[in-house]
Amino acid sequence: MALLQIAEPGLSPQPHQRRLAVGIDLGTTNSLVAAVRSGLSEPLADAEGQVILPSAVRYHADRVEVGQSAKIAASQDPFNTVLSVKRLMGRGLTDVKQLGEQLPYRFVGGESHMPFIDTVQGPKSPVEVSADILKVLRERAESTLGGELVGAVITVPAYFDDSQRQATKDAARLAGLNVLRLLNEPTAAAVAYGLDQKAEGVVAIYDLGGGTFDISILRLTGGVFEVLATGGDTALGGDDFDHAIANWIVTDAALSADIDPSAQRSLLQAACSAKEALTDAESVEVAYGDWRGTLTREALNALIEPMVARSLKACRRAVRDTGIELEEVEAVVMVGGSTRVPRVREAVAELFGRQPLTQIDPDQVVAIGAAIQADTLAGNKRDGGELLLLDVIPLSLGLETMGGLMEKVIPRNTTIPVARGQEFTTYKDGQTAMKIHVLQGERELISDCRSLARFELRGIPPMVAGAAKIRVTFQVDADGLLSVSAREMGSGIESSIQVKPSYGLTDDEVTRMLKDSFEYAGDDKVARVLREHQVDAERLLEAVQGALEADGERLLDEEERLVINLQMDELRELMQGTDGYAIEQQTKRLSQVTDAFAARRLDSTVKAALAGRNLNEIEE
């Protein structure tokens, strides 16, 4: 197992010198930067004592304005003021155009198909806008900490895809930041509460911000968090609470529903102030123009109950997706300023049967957790500890799939500890067992990779091919010990094995395996594509053959059966050769000629399943 020391050779810190690293919560509405100082992780304030930086950027002809002043100017200068740029990260021009009126910007395209916002300074990409926010946070940190940063841990939503994560890294680099790691926001929140120090358990992260809601279910095993499920609502947040209160004011004050933008902002500000006051008070006097009224907490609860219920529905769905029960969730962490609302906390406590963790400011908890991780990755000593080393996986870890192919689960050079999971399914109807073959290497075929271990998952409930869901999880702890577990999500049956993945491999052998992967990359790709087409063809042939035996006589006439059989024979013959393209095309032809047959079988199955049942019985 290769060890990567954080400090560069010859640049190691002095025994009592700390290397400056920060955690950054790059949020949709607000952003923060935090650092570990005197053993405590805390957010860093600006010159005015404010720790929260609104994620707003306004472009002038000769300067860039970031933060509260830019946010205030958004209504007067909408085309040059960018809000919620996080929603655009990693997206294409087509994606952002689908958002329509939600984004009041003038978009222009480029050769890369990346959306550019037309401003007085010229076209600005989401990466550039995010970089301007990060630059302010970097400068704040270096000014407060009194030195240059060695790096930052930046948080991202758990559902961010590769392009969104890469865009975040690009923005950091443009802002002059070295990214030590991108950390999932729910994981950062759990770290802030020290939940990573527990042996194991299931944790829920309830994140209700100004404009979005996210729920994440994490499993902790051996100090490693695995994201089991995510969910939420991109159109649900504290802003909706404000709009509900504003509508109440309009109704109670008998105001016209047609309010100009300036009056609308004042109305929403009054609503937001009332909401915040009711966090501690049972009632509050609300003033808007000449109107005065009283809003009680009970009335507020009634106004926001539909929105709170929507968040709880997403929570239940996320927990159900993991295959666990609500009672198995051992801790619930509250994230986002909107979780200060008492009714939200009450509802979450009622759902999970335990009081949520709220001791840390919900606006700051993600940045605080990221700072703890950054301090560790920077190589700073813990009390009484030695210089921390960051371990990496030298070769990819994966498993065998049909056709003798290597499916990588954890890529090489991934830092540990780490846990990754993927879902697989059965290949044949009625399959009740699955062989798990764990491999190490960079090649596409298992014959060119190193076998680490084999084990079996037995007791899979018999069902049609592709219906079972088997989640295979790879976990490497801080000592480089690999644990692989397989769990059938429906029945809960599980099997696992442990192995030391680097055992028996010298540095020269690792180098040789890497060299071979580069040298034979082209041949490997061709071989993999051929195998994949052969596997797809074989799977289709077996499925069609089984369908013919079960329902061919009942649902097809003689001519239809003859056409299907001729296409099957043609595909079997092509599978004996090495023309992957021909196999692919014939597989498509067979699929096309059996489409009508498949539709008839589906209709027949649905009719049988719904016979004697009403709509209420089949709804959630």
Curated annotation (Swiss-Prot):
CDD domains: ASKHA_NBD_HSP70_HscA. GO terms for biological process: iron-sulfur cluster assembly. The keyword Chaperone applies. GO terms for molecular function: ATP binding; ATP hydrolysis activity; ATP-dependent protein folding chaperone; unfolded protein binding. Keywords: ATP-binding, Chaperone, Nucleotide-binding. Gene3D superfamilies: 1.20.1270.10, 3.30.420.40, Actin, Chain A, domain 4 (3.90.640.10), Substrate Binding Domain Of DNAk, Chain A, domain 1 (2.60.34.10). InterPro entries: ATPase_NBD (IPR043129), Heat_shock_70_CS (IPR018181), HscA_NBD (IPR042039), HSP70_C_sf (IPR029048), HSP70_peptide-bd_sf (IPR029047), Hsp_70_fam (IPR013126), ISC_FeS_clus_asmbl_HscA (IPR010236). It holds the Pfam family HSP70. The keyword Mitochondrion does not apply. Chaperone involved in the maturation of iron-sulfur cluster-containing proteins. Has a low intrinsic ATPase activity which is markedly stimulated by HscB. HAMAP family: HscA (MF_00679). Belongs to the heat shock protein 70 family. NCBIfam families: HscA, PRK05183.1. This is Chaperone protein HscA homolog. It comes from Pseudomonas savastanoi pv. phaseolicola (strain 1448A / Race 6) (Pseudomonas syringae pv. phaseolicola (strain 1448A / Race 6)). The lineage of its organism: Bacteria, Pseudomonadati, Pseudomonadota, Gammaproteobacteria, Pseudomonadales.
